[in-house]
Amino acid sequence: MKRLTSDNKMLGYELMKAYPNISCFSTTRHGGCSKGNYASFNCNGYCGDEAEDVNRNRELLRSLLPGESVELVIPHQTHSDHVKVVDTIQVNTELEGVDALVTDIPGYCLCVSTADCVPVLLYDTRKKVVAAIHAGWRGTVARIVEKTVSVMDNQSVSYTHLRAH
């Protein structure tokens, strides 16, 4: 990983650097405006943090991302095996119980929150389909990565063009 910001708010992955049309990063707890137990750069609105602080952190994150219009898509993860395809109609709906997101639409930032779980990022370099997966032990046992690849397969991804991180 390498620092993408001097204040350590964002760390990047070298593996996906070869694909300039996507951004692949992790945020840290540094530099946010949340207070108390959430004194961090918390962008997850499902954990009990103040909505105003979460929204300010999300705006800060948007300002750090390349591109003029970035829509953050942040699901309410429940350690499930549920995969959701994000399109223009669904992006504004609540994403309850979703632990993996898939889209081929530019301008969406698919987000997953992790602590001791593993973020898995998939990208088809030909079809430009991307997935972000929250793989905790329950999701892993339920084969969430395999199920996400199956959903991507419905969008005609090519396994030879699929990259994973």
Short names for language-model regions:
Residues M1-H165:
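Active-site microenvironment for binding and transforming phosphate-containing groups
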